[in-house]
């Protein structure tokens, strides 16, 4: 059935297809229709897992970028995910980069996007989270507005942290999108140190205010040198971050040279990212020595490479591009088998 749906949406521009899918899932998540979707999916229960102090119904999640504004929480939830990471969301709404900005690399099962954090703003997202009936864990992925300078960047993250804290199972700090100018600079040196220090200080204040501890993860890029990775791992440990998501999209085109759309600017996700993200997980795991849990993301399209990420050191997994190419059966297969 999904193959038929995929054939239809693949006739559309990639972003239009994405928006159409979100609307379908929003409708499917409606209390009137959700039982129908659930009966079609027959989502297995999966294996509960406690990571970052949070109880996840199962270790399979939706990666950020799929439901940026939380418009289809209950629809995605009905597919069987143990957790959904919403966003990336910024303090105020922004349009993102010029269209077209999403491109399929069908033969490689990849996607290139240069969206640029297009979203309706944190307040819109929080309203959707408040109204959702989904029983799994909701993660909220936060970023900075394009017009905010690097020097002021931490203010945007603190603003979003304040808004999201009481409504999130965990929060992700996204400093690794390649589509906001200079954003990845926040992964390095004094910027990184200062950002994490500010975030941890604010987390302590909010934990006291709300009388609950909401863990904070950092999402990193796959395009890191060995020394950069070591430095990032050291900084994460030093600031006692609660989790790390490895990885975001890649700016490398090594795996797709010569393919249609490979020349497009932006971050590459899907199968071409598979090996690279797993290698980063493996190295990160060696550096972190079990002190900080890793959430693995990047190119998961089946049980084998999902298992590879677990063996490399990931405790939870996230999918997005694989869902586009393989449909809900991918989620079902992973939930049923990954512990």
Swiss-Prot record:
Family as reported in the entry's similarity comment: Belongs to the dihydroorotate dehydrogenase family. Type 2 subfamily.
Name of the coding gene: pyrD
Swiss-Prot/TrEMBL cofactor(s): FMN
Main location class: membrane
Compartment annotation: Cell membrane
Active site per database record: 177 (nucleophile)
Gene3D superfamilies: Aldolase class I
Membrane disposition: Peripheral membrane protein
Keyword Cell membrane (UniProt): yes
Residues reported in the UniProt entry to bind substrate: 68, 113-117, 174, 179, 248-249
Pathway assigned to this chain's UniProt record: Pyrimidine metabolism; UMP biosynthesis via de novo pathway; orotate from (S)-dihydroorotate (quinone route): step 1/1
Catalytic reactions on record: (S)-dihydroorotate + a quinone = orotate + a quinol
GO-annotated molecular function: dihydroorotate dehydrogenase (quinone) activity; dihydroorotate dehydrogenase activity
Residues that hold FMN according to the record: 64-68, 88, 141, 174, 219, 247, 270, 299, 320-321
Lineage of the organism: Bacteria, Pseudomonadati, Pseudomonadota, Gammaproteobacteria, Pasteurellales
UniProt GO cellular component terms: cytoplasm; plasma membrane
HAMAP family according to UniProt: DHO_dh_type2
Protein name in the entry: Dihydroorotate dehydrogenase (quinone)
InterPro entries to which the protein is assigned, alphabetical: Aldolase_TIM, DHO_dehydrogenase, Dihydroorotate_DH_1_2, Dihydroorotate_DH_2, Dihydroorotate_DH_cat, Dihydroorotate_DH_CS
Cross-referenced Pfam families: DHO_dh
This enzyme's EC code(s): 1.3.5.2
Enzyme superclass (EC): oxidoreductase
Cofactor-binding details, from the entry: Binds 1 FMN per subunit.
Function noted in UniProt: Catalyzes the conversion of dihydroorotate to orotate with quinone as electron acceptor.
Organism field: Haemophilus influenzae (strain ATCC 51907 / DSM 11121 / KW20 / Rd)
Alphabetical keyword list: Cell membrane, Flavoprotein, FMN, Membrane, Oxidoreductase, Pyrimidine biosynthesis
């Amino acid at each position: 059935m999904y193959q038929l749906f995929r054939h239809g949406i693949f006739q559309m521009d990639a972003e239009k297809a994405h928006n159409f899918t979100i609307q379908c899932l929003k409708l499917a998540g409606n209390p009137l229709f959700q039982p129908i979707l659930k009966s079609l999916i027959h989502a297995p229960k999966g294996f509960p897992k406690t990571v970052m102090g949070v109880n996840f119904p199962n270790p399979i999640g939706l990666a950020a970028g799929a439901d940026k504004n939380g418009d289809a929480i209950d629809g995605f939830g009905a597919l069987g995910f143990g957790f959904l990471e919403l966003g990336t969301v910024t303090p105020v709404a922004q349009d993102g980069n010029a269209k077209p900005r999403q491109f399929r690399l069908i033969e490689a099962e990849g996607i290139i996007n240069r969206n640029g954090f297009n979203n309706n703003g944190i307040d819109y997202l929080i309203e959707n989270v408040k109204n959702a009936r989904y029983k799994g864990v909701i993660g909220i992925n936060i970023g900075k507005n394009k017009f905010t300078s690097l020097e002021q960047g931490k203010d945007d993250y603190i603003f979003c942290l304040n808004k999201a804290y009481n409504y999130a199972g965990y929060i992700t700090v996204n400093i690794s999108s390649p589509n906001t100018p200079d954003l990845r600079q926040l992964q390095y040196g004094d910027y990184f140190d200062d950002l994490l220090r500010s975030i941890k200080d604010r987390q302590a204040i909010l934990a006291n205010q709300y009388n609950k501890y909401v863990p904070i993860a950092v999402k990193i890029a796959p395009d890191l040198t060995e020394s950069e990775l070591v430095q990032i791992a050291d900084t994460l440990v030093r600031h006692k971050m609660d989790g790390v998501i490895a990885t975001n999209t890649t700016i490398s085109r090594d795996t797709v040279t010569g393919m249609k759309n490979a020349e497009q600017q932006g971050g590459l996700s899907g199968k071409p990212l598979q090996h690279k993200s797993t290698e980063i997980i493996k190295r990160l795991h060696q550096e972190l020595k079990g002190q900080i849990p890793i959430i693995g993301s990047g190119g998961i399209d089946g049980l084998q490479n999902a298992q590879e990420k677990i063996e490399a050191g990931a405790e939870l997994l996230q999918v997005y591009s694989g869902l586009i190419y393989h449909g809900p059966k991918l989620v079902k297969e992973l939930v049923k088998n990954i512990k």
